[in-house]
From Swiss-Prot:
GN (gene name): ndhK
Record protein name field: NAD(P)H-quinone oxidoreductase subunit K
InterPro entries linked: NADH_UbQ_OxRdtase-like_20kDa, NADH_UQ_OxRdtase_20Kd_su
Top-rank lineage group of the source organism: Bacteria
Compartment annotation: Cellular thylakoid membrane
Gene3D superfamilies: 3.40.50.12280
Example GO molecular function: quinone binding
Entry keyword set: 4Fe-4S, Iron, Iron-sulfur, Membrane, Metal-binding, NAD, NADP, Plastoquinone, Quinone, Thylakoid, Translocase, Transport
Organism field: Prochlorococcus marinus (strain MIT 9312)
Cofactor(s) listed: [4Fe-4S] cluster
Reaction equations catalysed: a plastoquinone + NADH + (n+1) H(+)(in) = a plastoquinol + NAD(+) + n H(+)(out); a plastoquinone + NADPH + (n+1) H(+)(in) = a plastoquinol + NADP(+) + n H(+)(out)
Species lineage: Bacteria, Bacillati, Cyanobacteriota, Cyanophyceae, Synechococcales
Region (Disordered): 221-244
Biased composition (Basic and acidic residues): 221-236
PANTHER family: NADH DEHYDROGENASE, NADH DEHYDROGENASE [UBIQUINONE] IRON-SULFUR PROTEIN 7, MITOCHONDRIAL
Length: 244
């Protein structure tokens, strides 16, 4: 290499040798106004910023969800717009107990929602049946037996702050999805693989204990301490005067 060449000339010769086309030159104005991203990131950014929940409340948990609409919590800042039609919603928040009669309507609403769609199970009654799972014959023991659930939100009922936390976690899940891999990762099954085992216990309130001899026979030791009650008020006054 010629020692008389300047360092700048040597650098240009090396760049031309390594990359004959040269490095791409981007001006300062373009670098400050152009954002390089992928189609997945752009698509997910648009979806997670505009989750439209379907208003579906069957019990007291919906009162906490309705509080989000007010100015105190203002869930519009998350891009949540409540919808009354399943065809315009992509998020189903099941808030409250689901009964056997309401189960077909819930499944129908879920099937009418366009893809991609997400489900949040809100409250203990929605997740496991709650306090109605012990003796109710009409409560569904978990909404995941009917439709696939993406996020579980326990509580009785959950606070509005907990609903915000669930929405933020769902946004993170939406942001990590890929258009090409969505068919492989989405939940295609409706029913879960495990069952909520409920052991059948026979009722003990049969009334048989009333027919037992131990409940009908009065103890002889207590019979001696029982005195005859007075028939009228005059006899009561006489007894009281004798005691004085």
């Amino acid at each position: 290499m010629n020692p008389q060449l300047s360092p700048k000339a040597i650098r240009e010769i090396r760049e031309g040798t390594c990359n004959p086309l040269g490095a791409p030159q981007v001006t300062t104005d373009l670098s400050e106004n152009i954002i390089l991203t992928s189609l997945d990131d752009l698509h997910n950014w648009a979806r997670l910023s505009s989750l439209w929940p379907l208003l579906y409340g069957t019990a007291c948990c919906f009162i906490e969800f309705a509080a989000l609409i007010g100015s105190r919590f203002d869930f519009d800042r998350f891009g949540l717009v409540p919808r009354s039609s399943p065809r315009q919603a992509d998020l189903l928040i099941v808030a409250g107990t689901v009964t056997m009669k309401m189960a077909p309507a819930l499944v129908r609403l879920y099937e009418q929602m366009p893809e991609p769609k997400y489900v949040i199970a809100m409250g203990a009654c929605t997740i496991t049946g709650g306090m109605f799972s012990a003796d109710s014959t009409t409560a569904v023991r978990g909404v995941d037996k009917l439709i696939p659930v993406d996020l579980y939100l326990p509580g009785c009922p959950p606070r509005p702050e907990a609903i915000f936390d669930a929405v933020i976690k769902l946004r993170k899940k939406v942001g990590n999805e890929s258009i090409l891999e969505r068919e492989k990762t989405e939940q295609t099954h409706r029913y879960i693989t495990y069952k909520h085992e409920m052991n059948l216990v026979f009722s003990q309130n049969t009334g048989e204990y009333l027919n037992k001899t131990s409940t009908n026979v009065f103890p002889s030791s207590k019979k001696e301490k029982i005195t005859e009650l007075p028939e009228n008020r005059e006899q009561t006054e006489i007894i009281n005067s004798e005691e004085e």
